[in-house]
Amino acid sequence: MKVLKKIDIYIIKKFLGTYFFAIALILAITVMFDINEKLDSFLKAPLSATIFDYFFNFLPYFANLFSPLFTFIAVIFFTSKLADNSEIIAMLSSGISFKRLFVPYMISAAIIAALNLYLSCYVIPPANVTRIEYTNTYVKNKRVDYASNIQLQVEPGVIAYIARYDNSNKTGYRFSLEKFDKKVLKSRLTAQTINYDSAYHWRVNNYMIRNFNGMREELVRGMSLDTIVPIEPSDFLISQNDSEMMTTPELRRYIARQKERGVANIKNFEIEYERRFAMAAASFILTAIGMSLSSRKVKGGMGINIGIGLLLSFSYILFSTVTSTFAVSGATSPMLAMWIPNIIYTVIAVVLYKKAPK
C-alpha cells in the first residue's frame, strides 16, 4: 500500500507540475502576441494600468478559459513520457491495475477542476470588471449605450416600455407603464421622456396618467414627476461581456430576475453559467482520454500521442464554440449546448479506456 501511495504522489506531482508548466509556457507566448497586436493601444495607456489592470487580470482569465487544453496537453505529455520510458509497463507488471492507475489522474483532475470552478465562479469575474474597463477605455469600446423597443415586467402585473434609451444623457423616449389586475388594465402612465436619476428613481416628463375604474376613467396630466420604477439601465443595456463580470451567484440571480421580467436576450448569460460547470467537468473527461490514449508505448515516440492529443483538444474547444452558437440562435437550450461536447467526449473516453493496455 505504501508503494501505491508513493506512485500516487509521483503521478500527481508529474501531472500538476506539467500542467502549470504548460500554462506558464503558453501564457508567455500569448503575452508576446497580445503585446504585438495591441501595442498602439498599450502605448496610449499608463504603464501601471497596462500591467496591473490589464495583464494582471488577463492572464488568469486566459489560463482558466483554456484550462481543458492545458490539462490535456499535460496528461498527454507526461504520460507519453512515462510510457516511452517503460514506466507504465513497469507499474502494470508490478501488479497495479490500469483502473488503480487511474486514481492519481482523477485526483489531479479533481484538484484542477475545483481550482478552475472556484476561479471562474468567484475570482475571475471581479477581475474581469477591471480588465474589460481597461479594454473599453484604451483598446476597443464595446459598451452598449443605446437600446430600443424595451419591454419589461418590472413587477407582477406591471409592464414598462421604452421606445428608445440613450445612456449618454440617461434619457428614455416614449415611455409607458401599464398596471394590470388579472389581465384587466387598471392604470396607464405615458411620458414623452424619462430620465434616470439613481437606483430605481426616475423622472417622467410631459406625462399623462389614465386610471380606469370600471366604465369610469380619471385623467391626470403634468410636466414633470419623480417616481420609483424598479428597473435599472443595466437591465436592458446588455453587452456581450457583461456575463463574464458576474460571479456565479450573481449570474444565477440575474438570469432568474430577467426571466421573471420577460427579457429575451439572456442567452449569453445562460451559456456562461453552464459553461463554467461544463468546463470543470471537462477536466475529468479529457484526463481520461489523455491517459488512455498515451499510456501505450508506440514506435513513433510520444510525438504521435501529442499530435493526436492536440487534435482532440482543439476539436473539443471548436465543438464547444459551435454548440454555443446553437444556443444563441435558439436551436437548443444553453445547458444542452454546453454539455453536448462533454457527453460525446465521455463516449470517446470510455472507448479509449477499454482499448488501453491493461
Regions found by a protein language model. Name each.
Residues M1-P156, N167, M215, I231-K358:
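Transmembrane alpha-helices
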Residues K2-K5, A160, Y207, T227:
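Generic preference for hydrophobic/aromatic residues in regular secondary structure cores
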Residues V154-Y207:
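Structural signature for solvent-exposed beta-strand/loop edge elements and short helix-capping sites
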Residues V184-S187, F212-M223:
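A short, polar/proline- and glycine-enriched secondary-structure boundary/capping micro-motif
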Residues T190, N205, F212, F277-A278:
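Small/flexible residues
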Residues S198-E218, I238-M246:
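A short, charged
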Residues R221-I231:
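Non-transmembrane, solvent-exposed beta-strand/loop segments in proteins
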